[in-house]
Swiss-Prot record:
Name recorded for this polypeptide: Protein lin-9
Positions of region (Disordered): 1-77
Effect recorded for G341E: In n112; weak synthetic multivulva phenotype. Temperature-sensitive multivulva phenotype in a lin-8 n111 mutant background
Gene: lin-9
Biased composition (Basic residues): 50-62
Species whose genome carries this gene: Caenorhabditis elegans
Membership in a protein family: Belongs to the lin-9 family.
GO cellular component: DRM complex; nucleoplasm
Disrupted gene: phenotype observed: Decreased protein levels of DRM complex components including lin-37, lin-52 and lin-54. Double knockout with the programmed cell death regulator mcd-1 results in 100% lethality during the L1 stage of larval development. RNAi-mediated knockdown in a ced-1 mutant background results in reduced somatic cell apoptosis.
InterPro entries in the record: DIRP, LIN-9/ALY1, LIN9_C
Pfam families on file: DIRP, LIN9_C
Keywords attached to this entry: Developmental protein, Nucleus, Repressor, Transcription, Transcription regulation
Quaternary context: Component of the DRM complex, at least composed of lin-9, lin-35, lin-37, lin-52, lin-53, lin-54- dpl-1 and efl-1. Interacts with zft-11; the interaction is required to suppress the activation of non-neuronal genes in neurons.
Subcellular location: Nucleus
Function: Synthetic multivulva class B (synMuvB) protein. SynMuvB proteins are required to repress the induction of vulval development by Ras signaling and probably act by forming the multiprotein DRM complex that represses transcription. Required for the development of sheath cells in the hermaphrodite gonad and for the development of the male spicule, rays and gonad. In association with the zinc finger protein ztf-11, negatively regulates the expression of non-neuronal genes during neurogenesis.
Length: 644
């Protein structure tokens, strides 16, 4: 290339008249922009650029609306209020998007924001939109006082924390349109009263509704949060691992152990068996057993079953639900889900529910699929046991009445029996009741005076009840007549009918009290004089088993034996001894001996095979001798007398 023909870049560099530019090692075009790191104090402006820029720099719509970056109103908002985080974020966004237009502008020194004051910023009457924004900011300045103190969140008010979280939520949206829309919703939310549902609450409810449209999501929510009153206390009791640690290591008081120490404990406990089919079947079986025990405690039927052990139940149980309680029930037909309703009737192991939704008919629902609408009232298990015991005659003791002892949680005791033992001096001293002590009780014709008083009261109460029933029948007939003529009953008739019902209820209560008193005397004075001569062998055997259960229960109060199999074996052997004593007081037959042999055979089948030899040596040998003696005396005598 010849020297006469030069490139435009070299020509522009040689024709320049600026000495500073000729000394620069870089040759730039006239329209080039000089980076800030290569500029000196004087900014280089190309002639073409300066000619084009005749007025103020180009502004974004937001800057034109708000008066520009250097607007006094915006600066005052920045200095006087910390609620303008959203406005500052918008300004930063605009400055970053238009950085090329302001690259040659001098850098602005902004004052650091101060703590928010409860002062109103000066409004800008020239712009209506800006005035609305300023009014909104003025309305929320007092709510966000303390928002600048981010280094110490403990000093922040609840409103400040809420606003900070809201601002972080707004920052998730990138465009100005989305931020403006969310700010509008935020303003609407702040202007609402406490009774209205907030915008964010509606959004959360909509998200939750969309989630619950899926069947698996509904199933997960039911399994995770829907607990019946019975299951809630079972699943919320002490962790199984904590129970095993407490029972296996009673002297371990410190739970802050190292990883090596916990590893040693896990080795001693062994490998757990979980997530297998057998494991889940056993867990379901244990859960159903606990449910059955809780139902028996509610009903009081545990007194009739000696095999029920209450020590594995929770220390507190919820109060049983009654008719009229509002509940949430899990149903599968005609709809599958959880619906609200009211208990209409109580049935065994469930309730009859009338639902609020008219499309669902009244349904029988199990008690394990019902959740009370409200707070559960928890009561001690000893309360339910005392309620069940109070319904029994005072002469009849419960067969099993074991509750937790707060001082010894691994032992069980009967509260009512322990009280009576403390007063009487021990289980073998006999009951200490004045009705059994002939010296202190007043007798009239060989009958206790209190027994006769109860009998007279009961007779009078029965006569009164007959009159009330007769009066109630007449009122029912009048009600049918009035129902035929009109749809309403007179106020006087309603009051008379209600008074009759209340009187009848009071009479029934008094009758129950006197009947219990008569039953008490009957149990006390006829228990020792029961004639077994006319009783069948099976009835005698059952009576002896019940007496043996009472003896074992009383004697176990001081020993606190927890092995159920051992207690059952002791009870069976005691029943055999009582049966032998009963047979020794009368003439027996071959049927009685057969009944005794059946009892011994049942005991032999219940014990462990390793103990059969001991049972034969120490029990059956003596029973064989007794059997021989009875055959020679009682049974043969009975046979001879029958022949004569």
């Amino acid at each position: 290339m010849s020297s006469a023909v030069r490139s435009p870049r070299k020509k522009a560099a040689s024709d320049t008249s600026d000495p500073d530019r000729t000394s620069s090692p870089y040759s730039l075009r006239e329209t080039s922009k000089v980076p800030s790191r290569y500029r000196n104090e004087e900014l280089y402006l190309s002639p073409s650029r300066s000619i084009k820029r005749t007025g103020s720099p180009k502004k974004s719509p937001a800057k034109r609306l708000n008066g520009g970056r250097d607007s006094p109103s915006v600066n005052s908002l920045t200095r006087n209020s910390s609620l303008t985080m959203l406005a500052k974020a918008a300004l930063d966004y605009e400055s970053s998007s238009c950085a090329l237009e302001y690259i040659f502008q001098p850098k602005e020194e902004r004052r650091p924001p101060r703590r928010a004051l409860a002062l109103s910023p000066p409004p800008a009457p020239s712009n209506d939109l800006l005035a609305k924004d300023l009014e909104m900011i003025e309305m929320h300045q007092n709510l966000v006082a303390g928002l600048d103190d981010l280094d110490n969140p403990a000093n922040m008010t609840n409103e400040a924390v809420e606003h900070r979280d809201t601002q972080s939520f707004f920052n998730m949206f990138s465009t100005d349109q989305e931020r403006s829309a969310m700010m509008k919703q935020f303003k609407t939310y702040k202007n609402q009263t406490s009774e209205d549902v907030s915008t964010f609450m509606r959004a959360n409810i909509k998200k939750l509704y969309n989630l619950l449209r899926y069947k698996k999501a509904r199933q997960w929510v039911m399994c995770e949060f829907f607990y019946s009153a019975i299951d809630e206390q079972i699943f919320k009791e002490e962790n199984e691992f904590a129970t095993i640690i407490r029972e296996s290591f009673p002297n371990l008081k410190n739970w802050n152990l190292t990883r090596i120490e916990w590893r040693s404990i896990r080795k001693l406990l062994g490998k757990p068996r979980r997530c297998s089919k057998v494991f889940f079947e056993e867990e379901r079986m244990y859960l159903e057993e606990k449910r059955m025990k809780i139902r028996s405690v509610y009903e009081g039927s545990y007194l009739n079953d000696p095999s029920i052990d209450l020590k594995d139940l929770p220390a507190k149980l919820p109060r049983p639900m009654v008719v009229g309680n509002r509940v949430f029930a899990r149903i599968r037909n005609p709809y599958d889900g959880i619906y609200s309703g009211i208990i209409d009737a109580v049935i065994p192991k469930g309730f009859r529910i009338i639902f609020d939704k008219p499309d669902i008919p009244p349904t029988l629902v199990s008690d394990t699929e019902i959740l009370l609408d409200g707070k559960l009232d928890l009561l001690s298990i000893a309360y339910f046991i005392e309620q069940a015991n109070s319904k029994l005659p005072s002469g009849v003791r419960p067969f099993v009445a074991a509750v937790r002892d707060s001082s010894h949680p691994h032992l069980v005791r009967d509260v009512l029996v322990s009280r009576k033992i403390e007063r009487s001096g021990g289980p073998l001293m006999g009951p200490n009741d004045e009705r059994l002590n002939g010296k202190n009780a007043e007798m009239v014709g060989n009958f206790p005076l209190k027994f006769l008083v109860n009998l007279v009261k009961l007779t009078k109460l029965i006569d009164i009840k007959k009159g009330l029933i007769r009066q109630l029948n007449e009122l029912n007939a009048d009600a049918e007549i009035q129902n035929m003529t009109s749809d309403k009953y007179s106020k006087a008739f309603q009051e008379k009918y209600a008074k009759t019902i209340i009187d009848l209820e009071h009479v029934n209560q008094n009758i129950d009290i006197n009947m219990n008193g008569i039953q008490d005397h009957h149990m006390y004075f006829s228990s020792n004089d029961i004639s077994t001569s006319n009783m069948k062998p099976e009835a005698v055997r059952q009576m002896c088993s019940q007496q043996a259960g009472r003896f074992v229960e009383h004697c176990n109060q001081g020993l606190n034996v927890e092995n159920v199999h051992a207690l059952t074996l002791i009870q069976s052997l005691t029943a055999v001894l009582l049966q032998v004593r009963t047979m020794g007081t009368q003439k027996i037959s071959a049927v009685d001996l057969q009944s005794l042999g059946d009892a011994i055979s049942e005991i032999r089948t219940a014990i462990h095979p390793r103990n059969v030899a001991f049972f034969q040596d120490y029990v059956e040998v003596h029973m064989k001798q007794f059997h021989t003696i009875m055959l020679e005396s009682g049974a043969l005598a009975g046979t001879v007398s029958n022949r004569k």
